[in-house]
């Protein structure tokens, strides 16, 4: 069989693509010039400025909400911004097709954007400090620095897997003999991760946005407080209002996998 292509008269910035189950909906936001198409068995969407290969993202509809949330956490931790919709759906599709978390994180870490953001990768103590700031929003405590730095130096934790290990450590069960201060910090770290995950899901999945500058600004607006969470959410709504106009930005929404994290 030949490749099935759906062709459109405008550039991608004027369209919203929605993925749900095995269906793709394409909406022209320019006042109905191309209308709304409900598509099945289409491999490629062809616009004036580019073609979109749906096979790269279509399996994302099969990922569980829990796995999508974990992927968003890794994405934010490694890029230091909210996910872009297409990139997130690409990795979500790969995960649904069998790529493991460790393989995804390793592939992420090889990207120049990620490596440059961590600074000097030979300064392992600096990498640990950087990771705590970007993943947990705080300075590393002495115990954390003394725990992780030797593991990296001795190769017991691979550099590419450190962020994954750090996130999993936050979620791990608390030993019975740990202090209340340790418990309180662990709960605060988990809450910080959860808030950033909600913002990432809202930006990339619920709203389907991909502008990297906006994705960076959203995470910069959040500092761990409830007020900043609301401010970051409001910023997403603001940029979405501009992006969803007839000449805004390409939006790629994933429907039915995760709930709107800010739904009343």
Residue positions per predicted region:
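Substrate/cofactor-recognition hotspot
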Residues: 43-264
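Acidic, glycine-rich low-complexity repeat segments characteristic
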Residues: 1-64, 128-130, 135
């Amino acid at each position: 069989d030949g490749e099935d292509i759906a062709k459109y008269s405008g550039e991608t910035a004027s369209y919203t693509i929605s993925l749900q189950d095995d269906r793709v909906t394409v909406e022209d936001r320019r006042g109905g010039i191309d209308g709304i198409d409900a598509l099945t068995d289409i491999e490629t969407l062809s616009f004036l400025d580019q073609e979109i290969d749906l096979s790269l993202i279509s399996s994302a509809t099969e990922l569980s909400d829990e796995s999508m949330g974990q992927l968003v956490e890794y994405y934010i931790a490694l890029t230091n911004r909210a996910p872009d919709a297409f990139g997130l759906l690409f990795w979500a599709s790969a995960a649904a097709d069998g790529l493991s978390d460790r393989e995804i994180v390793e592939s992420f870490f090889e990207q120049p954007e990620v490596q440059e953001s961590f600074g000097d990768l030979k300064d392992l103590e600096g990498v640990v400090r950087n990771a705590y700031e970007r993943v947990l929003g705080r300075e590393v405590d002495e115990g954390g620095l003394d725990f992780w730095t030797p593991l990296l130096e001795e190769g017991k934790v691979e550099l590419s897997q450190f962020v994954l290990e750090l996130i999993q450590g936050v979620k791990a069960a608390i030993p019975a003999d740990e202090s209340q201060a340790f418990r309180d910090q662990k709960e605060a770290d988990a809450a910080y991760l959860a808030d950033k995950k909600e913002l990432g899901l809202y930006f990339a999945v619920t709203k389907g946005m991909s502008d990297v500058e906006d994705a960076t600004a959203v995470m910069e607006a959040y500092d761990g407080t409830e007020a900043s969470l609301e401010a970051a959410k409001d910023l997403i709504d603001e940029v979405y209002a501009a992006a969803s106009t007839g000449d805004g930005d390409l939006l790629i929404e994933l429907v039915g996998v995760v709930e709107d994290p800010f739904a009343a």
